[in-house]
């Protein structure tokens, strides 16, 4: 009689389980080797026991090359996998941005009063509240801008007033210093306005004509006027001028 069919379930007895694992592992490795030799196939077999011990068989020279070949056939190359993931992510991002742009364009048209037909009552009320909020924000921004400009102008005005006061104070101090310098009697270089120093050497320029009283009757009137003029401007005519005038009339 042949063997009965073995029920496929885990063997409860640990010893029997280990014996069965060793027998079947050897037969499996033998079958893998026979398959690779008889059919000229590239066979790779990896077995881990329940304790984590590794058993392997590879018909090629390197197990890693066989595994890379397996990965390329099933999952493609790592680079192509990364590129495909990036492409898929970029496509999803593009679709999100496209939907966002369409929503913004539709909202912009609604704010401009266009394409309001498909909107319902609630959507129109929401649009109205949005417009009111935008107007309040715009007015608040404009008011703040005007207040900032006003404050800036006030600061400039204050700076100009301070500069004007400083210049005025300097001008007054300079004027007072000049007046004190002009009217100070101890300053020998100062000269008063509208005053000339007295000339005590007028006699050096004035030489009266020496003539007989009886001879003055026959003099011309021009000589008399020249003499009177010389007496009036006694401090400004040099001595030689009178002699030239009298000689011209003689």
From Swiss-Prot:
Q: Which GO terms describe its molecular function?
A: DNA-binding transcription factor activity; protein dimerization activity; RNA polymerase II transcription regulatory region sequence-specific DNA binding
One Pfam family recorded for the sequence: SRF-TF
Location of the protein in the cell: Nucleus
Which keywords annotate this record?
Answer: DNA-binding, Nucleus, Transcription, Transcription regulation
Residue intervals of the K-box domain: 87-177
Q: Which InterPro entries match?
A: MADS-box/MEF2_TF, MEF2-like_N, TF_Kbox, TF_MADSbox, TF_MADSbox_sf
Checking CDD domains in the record gives:
MADS_MEF2_like
> In the record, which residues are listed under signal peptide?
none
Would you say which domain of life the source belongs to? Eukaryota
Describe tissue expression. Expressed in petals and weakly in sepals but not in the column (gynostemium).
Asked if DNA-binding is a keyword of the record, the answer is: yes
Q: What is a single cellular component term in the Gene Ontology annotation? A: nucleus
| BP GO annotations | positive regulation of transcription by RNA polymerase II
| Domain MADS-box span(s) in chain numbering | 3-57
Q: This chain belongs to which protein, by name?
A: Agamous-like MADS-box protein AGL9 homolog
Upper classification of the source organism reads: Eukaryota, Viridiplantae, Streptophyta, Embryophyta, Tracheophyta
């Amino acid at each position: 009689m042949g063997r009965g069919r073995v029920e496929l379930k885990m063997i409860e007895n640990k010893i029997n389980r280990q014996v069965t694992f060793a027998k079947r592992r050897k037969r499996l490795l033998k079958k893998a080797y026979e398959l690779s030799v008889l059919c000229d196939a590239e066979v790779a077999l990896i077995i881990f026991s329940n304790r984590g011990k590794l058993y392997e068989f590879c018909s090629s020279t390197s197990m890693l090359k066989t595994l890379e070949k397996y990965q390329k056939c099933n999952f493609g190359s790592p680079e192509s996998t990364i590129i495909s993931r990036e492409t898929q992510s970029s496509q999803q991002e593009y679709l999100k941005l496209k939907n966002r742009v369409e929503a913004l364009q539709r909202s912009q048209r609604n704010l401009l009063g266009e394409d309001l037909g498909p909107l319902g009552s609630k959507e129109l009320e929401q649009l109205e509240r949005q417009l009111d909020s935008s107007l309040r924000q715009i007015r608040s921004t404009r008011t703040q801008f005007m207040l900032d400009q006003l404050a800036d102008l006030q600061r400039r005005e204050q700076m100009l007033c301070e500069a004007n006061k400083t210049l005025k104070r300097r001008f007054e101090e300079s004027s007072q210093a000049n007046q004190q310098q002009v009217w100070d009697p101890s300053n020998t270089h100062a000269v008063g306005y509208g005053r000339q120093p007295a000339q005590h050497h007028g006699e050096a320029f004035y030489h009266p004509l020496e003539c007989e009283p009886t001879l003055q009757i026959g003099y011309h009137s021009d000589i008399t006027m020249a003499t009177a003029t010389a007496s009036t401007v006694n401090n400004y005519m040099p001595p030689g001028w009178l002699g030239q005038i009298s000689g011209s009339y003689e």
